[in-house]
Amino acid sequence: MIVSMIQFRIELPPLESIKDKRRIVSSLKEKLSNKFPLSVAEVDLQDSMRYAQIGAALVTNSKTFGESLMHKVLAFVENNCEGVLQDAEIFSETF
């Protein structure tokens, strides 16, 4: 069993409240879950109004497929996010 994962940080546009951040993050998580077979969560920086840290994972039997899908996720985020992608890390673990 292989778990492929991506973690990325987004710099958000200027926000007036944490509710605005939740709206942006929830929208992105929903878009990712609808488009890709992933589990998605905000994994860090929940109290930050400037940044969001998102993680997503996929259980697969192919490291190549999993990492290829994560690169597609990254491209999707770059083109469909209300913020600016700051950094991303893609990796896989075999269990």
Labelled PLM ranges:
Residues 36, 52, 84-86:
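Residue-level signal for beta-strand positions within conserved beta-sheet cores that form or flank
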Residues 38-44, 86-89:
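A short linear hydrophobic-aromatic micro-motif
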Residues 5, 26, 31-41, 66-67:
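Amphipathic alpha-helical assembly/interaction segments
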Residues 21:
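C-terminal binding/interaction regions
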Residues 12-17, 60-62:
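A generic structural motif
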Residues 3, 41-61, 93-95:
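Short, charge-patterned binding micro-sites
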Residues 59-95:
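C-terminal structural segments of small proteins and small subunits
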Residues 4-12:
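Short glycine-/aliphatic-rich beta-strand segments at the starts of folded cytosolic domains
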